Amino acid sequence: EAVEVDLQIHPIKAFLNLFSKKSYHVERFISKTFRRRLINILQEQEFDIVQIETIFLCPYIPDIRKHSRAHIVLRSHNIEHLIWKRLWGNTGAGLKKAYLKHLWTTLMRYELGILDKVDGIAAITRKDAEFLRSFTQVPIVDISYGIDSSHYPEPTFDNCEIPSLFHIGSMDWMPNQEGIKWFLSEAWPKVYENFPFLKFYLAGRNMPEWLLNGFWPNVVVIGEVEDAREFMLSKWIMVVPLLAGSGIRVKIIEAM
């Protein structure tokens, strides 16, 4: 069961958040509709464990405590504030850098402050688990990301465009945008100069306007694809420019 939540960035709300100590990243995930459905489910059924996927759903912890006796486990996919701190560090002086500082500092306060509110934490890497243990006595284990290999058959090169480069990812996530922006401005001109026949394909949900309307030689902006695995098998080499990140880059594992 799913409840649709509007996660679009609203400029007015984002601006007003500058005068708040709350994390705008987290505030975007708060939904009255989702809260009502969650409470209904908790009242209708009993659970031993409620697993919260990422810190962005932690605002619902009080509702879970009130309507359930279940233990609450946080599944931590990343150390979220470190991603935004690194983006801030890679940004030149100016209004954008000041805004990014507000984002990562408010997110840090929330992320570290919420750790003691849960009964257990499942980090996605050992490194993340060690970091989190520095800030809480709550039990922490590291459980890596896994895939069902039967869903990823042995690749063949029958329908693969050789040579070709590609990137796939959610393009409404700023670290992905910043990585691609760097690759197109710093790396791609050199690649194209030496391999003028090579094409670079960009795929992913919520492709931003600057990519859809931009032009770079031999760069093909596809946008959302129906089958990510089929798309990856149709191209040769995956490009994953990382300027800021934490946890595990799932798409790299899937591409392997």
Which residues are covered by each model-predicted region?
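Acceptor-binding helix/loop patch of EC 2.4 sugar-transfer enzymes
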Residues: L7-Y24, R28, I72-R109, S170
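Short N-terminal targeting/anchoring amphipathic segment
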Residues: L38-C58, H71-V73
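Structural alpha-helical scaffold elements that stabilize or flank donor/cofactor-binding regions
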Residues: I41-Q43, I114, E230-S234
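Donor nucleotide-sugar binding/catalytic pocket of nucleotide-sugar-dependent glycosyltransferases
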Residues: H71, H81, L100-E154
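Acidic donor-binding loop of glycosyltransferase active sites
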Residues: D119, L233-G247
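Conserved catalytic-core segment of nucleotide-activated headgroup transferases in glycan assembly
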Residues: S134, D142-S234
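Short alpha-helical segment that forms part of, or immediately flanks, the ligand-binding pocket
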Residues: R229, V250-M256
